[in-house]
Amino acid sequence: MSIQDYKGVFTFAQQVDNEITPVSFELIGKGKELAADIGCDVTAVLLGHGVADLADELAAYGADRVIVVDAPELEVYTTEPYVHAFVDIINKYKPEICLFGATAIGRDMAPRVSARVHTGLTADCTKLEINPDDKGLMMTRPAFGGNIMATILCSEHRPQMSTVRPGVMQKLPRDDSHKAEVINETVDGLADHVNVEVLEVVKAVAEKMNIQDAKVLVSGGRGMGSPENFKMLEDLADVLGGTIACSRPCVDNGWLPKDRQVGQTGQTVRPNVYFACGISGAIQHLAGMEESDIIIAINKDESAPMIAAADYGIVGDALKIVPLLTEALKKELA
């Protein structure tokens, strides 16, 4: 079989507790864009148990087809049954492109799927485009610690596979009038691949809001001087109903945990308002927040890239300005 025999864009529609993970909708949105360039449809692959009703939601966000594999062995995610089911779908339908979210599940599942279908995988992509010359998929990701961007091709094998970071791509507006063809598939031998028994699922209680969910992000950089000074950023975030984030140097210095990092080697965010306090604006950081609706930068250096990228720039010491701003907003919003 030649690579010309592979057709279509497939996305993994991840669900947990019968709730579709947001990145799944983002993959469909990007998949529609890619599919338009190569003249095909987008198929969402939905695995689980009792999940058939979720097909309409995937259709509303743009899926042209939804392949549903519904089985008791897929009720809770475990590696082998999910990998076996997805490999079976690939072998039957021969998609040209397969997209997974770069979530804990996607990162566990995608490399195993790619190995079993003997193709490559580009992980943590921040950009996907169709090459106008040969219609191949150009997959771009950070390399060398985020210092360069590498564009990777999979010209000799199919499907072309990538994991995509949550928040990088945009989902389409929901349209409940859009319907998809729903195909119910049965995968043989799932029980033979159950080698882990899940006894209990204990969910962690998040102490802070996920930065990708926040409408207002107050982000600090090396210019904040110390981890203790992030308390003033928390105060500002609390006034506005948001949460705090940071640039990579703050994580490298141990000031904040990795899940607070914005940028190419952290998370991509799109809040309504993004405060950049003491952040110079390295290209790696800008790539993770440049699509925020409003960017407000506070920096001593008026020539800092972050000031240039901001909708509103305040030139001055963030350690002095942030407390004043917090008090002013408290009075305004009281």
Residue ranges of predicted features:
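N-terminal glycine-rich FAD/FM-binding segment characteristic of electron-transfer flavoproteins
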Residues: M1-A334
